[in-house]
């Protein structure tokens, strides 16, 4: 079965005088951020502007798992700008759009995607963070539309995009493996969407962070797991087991 080669694998191949082996190419992924409010890191944000952090976090995540990411220029909130930036993504194995997928006057990604022939497979999921997720196909190119909130984009990258990258690399097509451990504190009842809570696995227990706002990258940066609460889950007590996936 296909596998990702580590240092020992490569040393073993060399010791057996195997100079060449067949491999899967690294999938190319075009990252497309949208929004008039965005500026690139290194630029000075104006009033009501924010830094486009999502593309850099996602590129680091996906490159570390074998992808080859290209960060495209920021697309502004016009059909013409979005179409021009989509054109730069032509030929990629996957296009990831970030932002522009929620309901709103300036959320044009779905409209422009339809204009250029992207076939939408689904839009919106019962999950938090990450409700306004979309996916489709643009010829042979996979298209995934991620939410614009920083934590939402990265959580959806872990849950949905990494399995696609693995499939493109010929690795098993499986969702992130869930584990379980006791809670370090009580957790309130959950609402109608499955909740991927930022948490830390420490000394055999799951410590769920109190603040779970989808804009708080500082909390995600401290987390090493996502604790999973099913939709409509009852309150959980300290010591109850909870499922999680490692980050």
What is each stretch, according to the model?
Residues 59-115:
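N-terminal small/polar loop signature for handling phosphorylated ligands or for N-terminal nucleophile
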Residues 112-247:
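Flexible glycine/proline-rich
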Residues 1-71, 226:
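Short, glycine/charged-enriched hinge/interface segments at domain edges or termini
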Residues 31, 62, 96, 199, ...:
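Residue-level signal for inorganic ion chemistry
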Residues 36-37, 100-103, 148:
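Short glycine-rich anion-binding loops that position phosphate/pyrophosphate groups of nucleotides
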Residues 1-5, 11, 95, 236, ...:
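Generic structural signal for buried aliphatic residues
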Residues 1-2, 17-23, 86, 123, ...:
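A generic local secondary-structure boundary/capping motif
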Residues 50-55, 75-80, 123-132:
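A general structural motif
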């Amino acid at each position: 079965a296909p596998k990702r080669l580590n240092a020992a694998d490569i040393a073993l191949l060399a010791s057996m005088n195997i100079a060449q082996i067949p491999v899967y190419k690294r999938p190319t992924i075009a990252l497309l951020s949208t929004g008039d409010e965005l500026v690139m890191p290194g630029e000075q944000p104006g009033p009501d502007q924010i830094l486009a952090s999502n593309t850099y976090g996602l590129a680091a995540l996906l490159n570390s798992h074998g992808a080859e990411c290209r960060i495209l220029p920021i697309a502004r909130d016009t059909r013409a700008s979005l179409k021009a930036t989509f054109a730069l993504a032509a030929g990629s194995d996957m296009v990831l759009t970030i932002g522009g997928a929620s309901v709103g006057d300036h959320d044009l990604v779905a409209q422009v995607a339809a204009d250029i022939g992207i076939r939408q497979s689904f839009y919106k999921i019962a999950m938090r963070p990450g409700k306004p997720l979309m996916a489709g196909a643009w010829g042979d190119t996979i298209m995934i539309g991620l939410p614009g909130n920083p934590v939402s984009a990265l959580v959806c990258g872990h849950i949905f995009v990494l399995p696609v990258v693995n499939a493109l690399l010929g690795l098993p097509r499986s969702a992130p493996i869930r584990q379980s451990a006791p809670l370090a504190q009580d957790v309130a009842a959950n609402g109608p969407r499955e909740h991927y809570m930022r948490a830390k696995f420490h000394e055999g227990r799951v410590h769920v962070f109190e603040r779970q706002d989808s804009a708080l990258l500082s909390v995600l940066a401290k987390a090493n797991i996502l604790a999973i609460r099913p939709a409509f889950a009852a309150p959980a007590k300290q010591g109850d087991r909870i499922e999680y996936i490692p980050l």
